[in-house]
Amino acid sequence: MIKVSDVCFSYTNNMDQLVLKNINVVFEKGKYYAILGHNGSGKSTFSKILSGIFKPQKGSIEVDGVLLNKENLTKIRKKIGIIFQNPDNQFVGATVEDDIAFSLENINEDPKKMSQIIANLAAKVQMESYLDREPQFLSGGQKQRVAIASVLALNPEIIIFDEITSMLDPRGKYDVVKILDDLRKDKTKTLISITHNMNEAILADEIIVFANGGIIAQGDPKLILNDKNIIEKAKIDSPFIYKISSALKLVSPTYDENELLEQLWKLKQKTS
């Protein structure tokens, strides 16, 4: 369990310029959470605080009752896996197999057993046929699936997905969201997804909505995403709009998805 209490953060150490303001939230073990919000809402900064990359000026974070601070940082980080928007910096091996194996370096098994473990992890993300491929030559969606397999190899209790589908084409998004859905069903890990992707968010047990550095709503995804007031305050796209934009981009990949979403959002506001 992760308990966040009265967390405030400023990049300038100025409490009058807070990016996050009095954040209070509890993440229960085995649940899947989606954190939604517009650009600049504070959600990505929050993910870096959860993973120990940033330290808040005020408030505290506890992981299974242990305070996240300088003394406990190494211990807690072993419980947390994080996958970033661009996975290229996470690749350390010449092949997909090497990358997954690197995360298993502390496991003492005979080579045959290790090969089976790696194959099983690759199969979880539908990459078992790519073990001998070089990561840099994979598609964006395939790279993210390899990054997920490498994090799963570490067997963390908590996995943070930081905007992992935002740079992917519709097919890549679909493949990665399918993996997230499979992980969600497992119920053995706490999953926290920082996302703009409605298809990710709707799968969550709970959605947490950020706006202007604070949490403005938390609860059941269907209730949250069907609440017009929350959608407008958070400046996020409704699932209906996202589905239309994804469908149009499949038909014509040259569409600018962000521009398309903006136009569809304006159209929906006029017809609501």
Swiss-Prot record:
It is a peripheral membrane protein. Transmembrane segments: none annotated. Its main location: membrane. ATP binds at residues 37-44. Forms a stable energy-coupling factor (ECF) transporter complex composed of 2 membrane-embedded substrate-binding proteins (S component), 2 ATP-binding proteins (A component) and 2 transmembrane proteins (T component). It is found in: Cell membrane. The gene is ecfA1. Keywords: ATP-binding, Cell membrane, Membrane, Nucleotide-binding, Translocase, Transport. The keyword Repeat does not apply. It holds the Pfam family ABC_tran. Gene3D superfamilies: P-loop containing nucleotide triphosphate hydrolases. GO terms for cellular component: ATP-binding cassette (ABC) transporter complex. NCBIfam families: ECF_ATPase_1, PRK13648.1. Belongs to the ABC transporter superfamily. Energy-coupling factor EcfA family. The keyword Cell membrane applies. The lineage of its organism: Bacteria, Bacillati, Mycoplasmatota, Mycoplasmoidales, Metamycoplasmataceae. ATP-binding (A) component of a common energy-coupling factor (ECF) ABC-transporter complex. Unlike classic ABC transporters this ECF transporter provides the energy necessary to transport a number of different substrates. Its EC number is 7.-.-.-. This is Energy-coupling factor transporter ATP-binding protein EcfA1. It is an enzyme of class 7 (translocase). Residues 2-237 form the ABC transporter domain. One of its GO terms (molecular function) is ATPase-coupled transmembrane transporter activity.
